[in-house]
């Protein structure tokens, strides 16, 4: 089954730590909250520096869509931009984020340990889909997608939720592929 999740319909929700807002792209199981999800994908606009919310037993993957950000962990500092590979880290480890030179838009994937594993990759072109329960494709720019003999048009930040994915996928512009197993 394939569902298009339009960016235009997303509602801004306050962050757990009260320091900003995020827009949920998709969550599993549907309707679950921050305490009950197996996985959750959201997009945030970050304007100010501050600590990331701590999520016990959650693994996170952060991908910058626009802008640059420094992340400070207890043992390292990492700078990311819109060309960086997605960065995975434990959600229960303290992290402090600082936008560099202006606002940042990021994609945040959270997976509950013991229930789900998430893998995020930047993609373009044709590829074999990974063996996963769910695959989510998030358009970075306007993107034409072909999957399961369907041709679909995605606008910026629209997403496809594919349950029990088929063999292959073709995207004609940069996108993010999230495999959830």
Locations of regions flagged by a protein language model:
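Jelly-roll (double-stranded beta-helix
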Residues: 1-181
């Amino acid at each position: 089954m394939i569902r298009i999740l339009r960016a235009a319909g997303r509602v801004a929700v306050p962050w757990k730590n009260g320091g900003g807002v995020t827009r949920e792209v998709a969550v599993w199981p549907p309707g679950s909250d921050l305490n009950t999800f197996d996985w959750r994908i959201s997009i945030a606009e970050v304007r100010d520096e501050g600590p990331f919310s701590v999520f016990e037993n959650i693994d996170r993957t952060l991908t910058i869509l626009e802008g640059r950000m420094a992340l400070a962990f207890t043992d390292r500092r990492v700078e990311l931009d819109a060309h960086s590979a997605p960065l995975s880290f434990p959600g229960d480890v303290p992290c402090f984020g600082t936008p560099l030179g202006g606002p940042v838009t990021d994609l945040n994937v959270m997976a509950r340990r013991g229930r789900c594993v998430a893998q995020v990759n930047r993609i373009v072109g044709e590829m074999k889909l990974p063996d996963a329960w769910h695959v989510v494709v998030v358009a970075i720019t306007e993107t034409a997608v072909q999957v399961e003999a369907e041709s679909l048009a995605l606008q910026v930040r629209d997403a496809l939720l594919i349950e029990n994915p088929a063999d292959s996928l073709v995207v004609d512009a940069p996108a993010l592929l999230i495999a959830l197993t």
